[in-house]
């Protein structure tokens, strides 16, 4: 029997009891990959984000640059806070601050973009000593919205230049297709992967953003498996499964996906086939991170991110039959 979202909602009470009694089936063997969560919704209060992660028990945390601005010159102090809480930094995403260039399509601006990203990887990510990749978004779309192949080539050249330097640090550069950004559709994603050098550029596959961009996230992961650095677990509305067109509007706050993201346990989720994805990652002996990339737009009224994380973790235990806190 297929365990659907509706079945999950209807039987959650019974499963909660079974889980508490240790009656749920365990994974056949320890997983080769680990789970983390995003710190994006805590702003600069990275200390509170760490405390929440410690309480819910996830082993990895993924901040953005804007989350760690108070630690840019003291990464080892932040590493100690994480270590003391039993956490490891998965990676740190780019972005944040007027001093940091995120333009990947204008040849006049990409030299600073390249320099800023190499410096951030060298001065902040590398000192952690164990981060093997640099997840990054690719900045805004150009004025007029449409993106040409020539502009994707400018982006690819910049990524190749950054990746050529970060790989010397033992860090794989892993761009993240993201609705509302320079790289959001299937054509743009595949063109970028075609134009980037696999020796220097990998991929962060966000299941929700790929779905909202009109892609099948499992197919994208399969097609670029040798270059997969990280997976973001985040759902989308059920009716978008199998869709082939961009789902989000071109302008406004929803252009970046806000209002379209779904938690794994949301009743109207199901745009992503997580049971099939999980089985594939296990079969392929995936050795990276899977991150619950949840943001403030996904918090129901009257709740908070800690409770949201607990709900997503419960779905993973009850439906995917894995406790992300223990792997």
Residue ranges and their predicted role:
Residues 12-21, 27, 104-203, 304-306, ...:
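Active-site acidic/histidine proton-transfer and metal-coordination neighborhood
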Residues 29-34, 94-102, 138-142:
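N-terminal small/glycine-rich loop or linker at the start of catalytic domains
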Residues 33-38, 61-63, 89-94, 132-136, ...:
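Hydrophobic faces of well-ordered beta-strands that scaffold small-molecule active sites
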Residues 86-97, 116-126, 202-208, 260-263, ...:
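Short, basic, helix/turn surface patches
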Residues 2-23, 29-35, 47-54, 186-201, ...:
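Histidine-acidic metal/acid-base catalytic patches
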Residues 40-60:
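N-terminal targeting signals for Sec/Tat export/insertion, comprising classic cleavable signal peptides
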Residues 30, 50-55, 72-92, 119-130, ...:
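Acidic (Asp/Glu)-rich catalytic clusters
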Residues 40-46, 64-75, 98-102, 113, ...:
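Acidic-and-aromatic substrate-binding clefts and catalytic sites of carbohydrate-active enzymes
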């Amino acid at each position: 029997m297929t365990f659907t979202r509706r079945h999950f909602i209807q039987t959650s009470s019974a499963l909660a009891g079974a889980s508490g009694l240790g009656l749920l089936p365990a994974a056949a063997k320890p997983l080769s990959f680990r789970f983390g969560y995003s710190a994006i919704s805590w702003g600069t209060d990275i200390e509170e984000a760490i405390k929440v992660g410690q309480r819910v028990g996830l082993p990895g945390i993924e901040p953005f640059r804007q989350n760690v601005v108070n630690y840019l010159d003291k990464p080892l102090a932040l590493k100690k806070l994480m270590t003391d809480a039993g956490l490891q930094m998965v990676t740190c995403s780019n972005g944040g601050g007027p001093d940091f260039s995120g333009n990947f399509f204008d040849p006049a601006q990409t030299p600073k973009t390249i320099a800023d990203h190499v410096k951030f990887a060298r001065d902040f990510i590398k000192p952690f000593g164990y981060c093997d990749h640099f997840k990054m978004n690719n900045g805004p779309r150009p004025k007029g919205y449409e993106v040409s192949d020539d502009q994707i080539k400018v982006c690819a050249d910049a990524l190749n230049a950054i990746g050529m330097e970060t790989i010397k640090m033992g860090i794989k550069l892993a761009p993240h297709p993201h609705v509302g950004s320079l790289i959001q559709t299937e054509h743009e994603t595949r063109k970028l992967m075609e134009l980037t050098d696999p020796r220097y550029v990998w991929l962060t596959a966000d299941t929700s953003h790929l779905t909202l961009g009109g892609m099948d996230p499992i197919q994208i992961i399969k097609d670029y498996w040798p270059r997969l650095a990280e997976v973001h677990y985040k759902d989308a509305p059920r009716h978008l499964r199998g869709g082939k067109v961009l789902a989000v509007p071109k302008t406004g706050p929803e252009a970046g996906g806000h209002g379209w993201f779904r938690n794994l346990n949301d009743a109207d989720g199901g745009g992503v086939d997580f049971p099939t994805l999980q089985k594939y990652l296990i079969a392929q002996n995936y050795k990276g991170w899977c991150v619950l990339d949840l943001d403030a737009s996904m918090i129901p009224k009257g709740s908070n991110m800690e409770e949201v994380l607990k709900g997503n973790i419960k779905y993973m235990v009850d439906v995917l039959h894995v406790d992300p806190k223990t792997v």
